[in-house]
Amino acid sequence: MLKTISPLISPELLKVLAEMGHGDEIIFSDAHFPAHSMGPQVIRADGLKVSDLLRAIIPLFELDSYAPPLVMMAAVEGDSLDPTVEARYRDALSLQTPCPEIVRIDRYAFYERAQKAFAIVITGECAKYGNILLKKGVTP
């Protein structure tokens, strides 16, 4: 047992976070995301909300300061976003100061980034457009 590490962070996720280098990306996805067909390592976090995992990992994870470190999927034409999803994520990420802006990219651009990600953490999140990409930075 390690002190000050949230019990929400599985040993597998902790290992992946430690193995990632600066510039590597990790996806925290909703339960509907096609993670297993994307290619990178998939970590299961069934039953957990993305916002809870973000809150747990952000004290351990330095976000990139040279490129946008937070990326979410934009709504498909004719669809709409639920603003409370981004608000929950921003609240969870607020432990990182200053908290960078969240950039939105189109669905297929997000899928391309996911295929190149270091890992995808598939959660129990059911919110529409509930996926977020984090780019790891260099510790100061």
UniProtKB/Swiss-Prot annotation:
Domain of life: Bacteria
Main location as per UniProt: cytoplasm
UniProt catalytic activity: alpha-L-fucose = beta-L-fucose
Pfam families: RbsD_FucU
Pathway: Carbohydrate metabolism; L-fucose metabolism
GO cellular component: a single term: cytoplasm
InterPro entries: L-fucose_mutarotase, RbsD-like_sf, RbsD/FucU_mutarotase, RbsD_FucU
Record bears the keyword NADP: no
S-S bridge residues: none
Molecular function (Gene Ontology), one example: fucose binding
Enzyme class: isomerase
Residues bound to substrate: 30, 107, 129-131
One of the protein's GO biological processes: L-fucose metabolic process
Enzyme Commission (EC) number: 5.1.3.29
Compartments where found: Cytoplasm
Function description: Involved in the anomeric conversion of L-fucose.
Subunit structure of this chain's protein: Homodecamer.
The protein, known as: L-fucose mutarotase
